[in-house]
Amino acid sequence: MATTLNPSEISELIKNRIEKVKLAAESRNEGTVTSVSDGIVRIFGLADVMQGEMIELPNNSFALALNLERDSVGAVVLGGYEHLREGDVAKTTGRILEVPVGPELLGRVVNALGEPIDGKGPLGTDLTAPVERVAPGVIWRKSVDQPVQTGYKSVDSMIPIGRGQRELIIGDRQTGKTAMAIDAVINQKGTGIKCVYVAIGQKASTIANIVRKLEENGALAHTVVVAATASESAAMQYISAYSGCTMGEYFMDRGEDALIVYDDLSKQAVAYRQISLLLKRPPGREAYPGDVFYLHSRLLERAARVSEEYVEKFTEGKVTGKTGSLTALPIIETQAGDVSAFVPTNVISITDGQIFLETDLFNAGIRPAVNAGISVSRVGGSAQTKIIKKLSGGIRISLAQYRELAAFAQFASDLDEATRKQLERGQRVTELMKQKQYAPMSIANQALSIYAVNEGYLDDVPVNKLLAFEEGLHAHFANTQGELINKVNATGGWDNDIEGAFKKGIAEFKTTGSW
């Protein structure tokens, strides 16, 4: 006997079945790739895209949205783009570019996206942070009053750098800019300062050599190397500086001190210019886009010394009573010593001072080739170690007077005694400021050398034997006054007892004649 259903039962069954069906509504924002060339993709039909948003492309590749136009989006591909074709589907992700952060990155070499490229396996961190971030506000900042020792006599005495400062290293190619920055990184061993070295647009062989030198000097353990080599795309070279800054900020935000080197921002500006021109943005001076100043200012403003309140707020009370800092050493390469070019003037105006390295000094054998006349540190003076501040006052004056008199003495037939003495003192100060690469000097040894030249102990030492005398003097104090040297290095203090010990020790060493 057949079962009969009346219409109301049928409609009830259908209604129940419909109610049981769960349809998950999924909203997708998709567009179509209309052109691919030189690492730039144009996408039609994407709506609600953020500036700097990650756009998903086929084969697990991504692009960064930079141009938001009326009916299309101009984006730069991160990595290879050979597999992309016109008509490919592009999707928004709702995410800004993030990179891995954390202490696990120390001792590693990563690319601009934070992916390890040193063959040592995964990083072992799940923490990430956005590459672009607003710099700490004025309220959260503290004044710079703690030193960052570079280990260079000329820098620590005349152009001191403080924690949270931005100090530009500027000069022509092959004047020792990278060498100075690497020595500063090496000198942080044992100080607790974490370092980030960002290599932008350099040869892979050069970066490999730097990593090897850091390892040999025991500095790689406290350093992250971010490498965007010359063979990588302009997008990777542009992003790398911000990625490195994010990795350094991790330590600053948690009440620690970090040092970051950008080597160099000239190449980053060139990479950004390339991207901007390919995106058809209007060119300005030297064909750079109008926002090239903002490119560097938003990066360098993220270097700061932040207050205890900032650290406590950021860590939600887990870290209290500690200030954090990120010190930046940006490098700029000039062409034929022209510091009035567009990018050098921009970065000089953003930073808190500059160390100017000169080709003529470098070729004359004065290395580091620091031009003390136009090098300056605007905020580092208040962070300088007490003993160095006390002793180094006469160094800059001696050098300035020497340069002035040396130019004048070329035209004078005979010189009076006072002028001759000033010239000889200047010669000795210039010679004493020379220093070998990968040989950073401790505070006590710097103080010893400066004290000896200021007090006239080196006036009777031949100029060509000065560096040998200095080396012997340091060895003599290490053997006979080890406790004093350790005390000065630990406290950075200066008193009559230390001065008396310096006088006695230098006089003793001079009588040995073992130099």
From Swiss-Prot:
GO CC terms on record? Answer: plasma membrane; proton-transporting ATP synthase complex
Known catalytic reactions: ATP + H2O + 4 H(+)(in) = ADP + phosphate + 5 H(+)(out)
Record keywords: Transport included?
yes
Q: Report if keyword Phosphoprotein is assigned.
A: no
Q: What class of enzyme is it?
A: translocase
Q: Which Gene3D superfamilies match?
A: 2.40.30.20, ATP synthase alpha/beta chain, C-terminal domain, P-loop containing nucleotide triphosphate hydrolases
Required for activity, annotated site positions? S375
GO molecular-function term, one example from the UniProt record: proton-transporting ATP synthase activity, rotational mechanism
Q: Where in the cell is it found?
A: Cell inner membrane
How this chain sits in the membrane, per its record, is: Peripheral membrane protein
**EC numbers on record:** 7.1.2.2
**UniProt-annotated binding residues for ATP:** G171, D172, R173, Q174, T175, G176, K177, T178
Keywords in alphabetical order, please.
Answer: ATP synthesis, ATP-binding, Cell inner membrane, Cell membrane, CF(1), Hydrogen ion transport, Ion transport, Membrane, Nucleotide-binding, Translocase, Transport
Q: Which HAMAP family does the record cross-reference, listed alphabetically? A: ATP_synth_alpha_bact
Q: What does this protein do?
A: Produces ATP from ADP in the presence of a proton gradient across the membrane. The alpha chain is a regulatory subunit.
The record's subunit annotation is: F-type ATPases have 2 components, CF(1) - the catalytic core - and CF(0) - the membrane proton channel. CF(1) has five subunits: alpha(3), beta(3), gamma(1), delta(1), epsilon(1). CF(0) has three main subunits: a(1), b(2) and c(9-12). The alpha and beta chains form an alternating ring which encloses part of the gamma chain. CF(1) is attached to CF(0) by a central stalk formed by the gamma and epsilon chains, while a peripheral stalk is formed by the delta and b chains.
Q: Which family does it belong to?
A: Belongs to the ATPase alpha/beta chains family.
Q: This protein is called what?
A: ATP synthase subunit alpha
Lineage of the native species? Answer: Bacteria, Pseudomonadati, Pseudomonadota, Gammaproteobacteria, Lysobacterales
